């Protein structure tokens, strides 16, 4: 009987493996053959790595790259001039598609239905969306019923047959199925939440629906607002790309970081909110920081550090021979500040201390009276580890699976008081002797 049960179990396990393999094969067959270049914004036109990568993915020298100025306001066509130069210096034959809300002599809705213009984009091997307001891109490329226009269908054809779709800032936000549309600062999102059709809206969905895209992520502390949107829409994973940095995604799965800084990977698949709290809270978020050269499989979420880090220092806080560089407690008064979260993650994985605290609040609101804020508690777990190298000329970390709990707090106000000269303080404060005699 035991042998029979074992045989049945083994057969079931084998069937499950075969079924999973077949499902993966079907997904691979249906997946677009092209690549995405998701740029966090503020890219430098003289840094060749990004532009060389876009052109290479579009087919190399002579690649036809269609540039969409749609997100820009003011002078969208003029804005594209430096971009055209950067791509053409890298070998492309790029052109600007006149789908814009100003500076062109035709209506946007007319342009996206123009057969000649649509065919020119369809024949391209790459598409590039510039920055601005992502709502302008979506409003142009979806019709009144929120269905794909002929122009968007042509863009999808470029992607499916092996071309590249690149976008910076607003052009990065549209990559996911859900995007921020016109969002206030991160602290305001933490306090007030998000509503579909207002702060968040439909993106164009080039990336898998389980992934949310955030841009200008580290410089502007936007990882916090991304967590609110992800939790609201039940999106388990997020990609936060920093400025002058890109995540290159091939065939929708294999992704590599290029550029100046890094990418934050947000995982709320096991996170829970406190149902007793009206304010936003989340427990057991996982954060990983990927630096230039690091790769991640978006399907399995397996991370491969850059070769320079694999050949240098591995940091395993749970190993018996763990010898961290830092030995101090960490408290960040503005965790939403410029690159604060990336700095914290690097120092926490390489520290004798196993947790760190960050606060998010408005100093202006708290100057005179109490105000609402949030505590971010970062802590290592059994799965936390990292790598370190100085090969790039600085302190570069790759950090995996730092845990995070967010909970609302009350900041006592006034936040501070001015000190008085000692003589004035003595005059205003009765001496102990005087108090006793009275």
List each language-model region with its residue ranges.
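Short internal beta-strands
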Residues: 66-70
């Amino acid at each position: 009987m035991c042998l029979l049960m074992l045989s049945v179990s083994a057969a079931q396990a084998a069937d499950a493996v075969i079924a999973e393999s077949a499902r993966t094969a079907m997904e691979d067959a249906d997946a677009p053959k092209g690549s995405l270049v998701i740029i966090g914004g503020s890219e430098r036109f003289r840094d060749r790595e990004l532009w060389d990568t876009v052109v290479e993915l579009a087919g190399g020298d002579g690649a036809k790259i269609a540039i969409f100025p749609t997100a820009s306001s003011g002078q969208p066509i003029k804005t594209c001039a430096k971009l055209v130069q950067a791509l053409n210096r890298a070998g492309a034959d790029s052109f600007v598609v006149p789908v814009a809300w100003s500076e062109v002599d035709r209506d946007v809705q007319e342009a996206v239905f123009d057969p000649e213009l649509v065919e020119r984009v369809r024949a391209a091997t790459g598409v590039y969306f510039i920055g601005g307001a992502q709502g302008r891109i979506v409003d142009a490329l979806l019709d009144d019923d929120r269905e794909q226009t002929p122009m968007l269908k042509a863009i999808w054809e470029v992607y499916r047959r092996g071309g590249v779709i690149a976008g910076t800032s607003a052009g990065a936000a549209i990559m996911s199925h859900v995007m921020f549309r016109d969002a206030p600062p991160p602290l305001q999102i933490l306090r007030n939440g998000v509503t579909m059709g207002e702060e968040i809206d439909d993106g164009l969905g080039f990336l898998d629906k389980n992934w949310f895209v955030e841009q200008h992520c580290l410089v502007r502390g936007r990882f916090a607002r991304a967590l609110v949107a992800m939790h609201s829409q039940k999106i388990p994973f997020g990609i936060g790309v920093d400025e002058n940095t890109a995540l290159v995604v091939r065939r929708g799965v294999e992704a590599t970081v290029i550029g100046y800084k890094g990418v934050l990977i947000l995982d709320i698949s096991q996170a829970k909110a406190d149902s007793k709290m009206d304010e936003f809270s989340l427990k057991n978020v996982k954060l990983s920081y990927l630096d230039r050269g690091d790769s991640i499989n978006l399907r399995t979420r397996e991370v491969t550090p850059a070769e320079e880090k694999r050949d240098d220092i591995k940091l395993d806080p749970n190993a018996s021979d763990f010898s961290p560089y830092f030995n101090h407690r960490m408290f960040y008064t503005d965790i939403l500040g410029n690159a604060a979260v990336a700095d914290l993650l690097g120092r926490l994985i390489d520290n004798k201390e196993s947790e760190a605290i960050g606060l998010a609040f408005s100093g202006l609101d708290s100057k005179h009276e109490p105000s609402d804020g949030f505590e971010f508690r970062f802590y290592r777990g059994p799965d936390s580890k990292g790598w370190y190298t100085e090969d790039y000329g600085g302190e570069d970390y790759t950090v995996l699976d730092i845990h995070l709990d967010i909970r609302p707090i009350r900041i006592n106000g006034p936040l501070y008081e001015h000190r008085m000269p000692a003589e004035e303080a003595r005059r205003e404060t009765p001496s102990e002797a005087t108090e006793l005699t009275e």
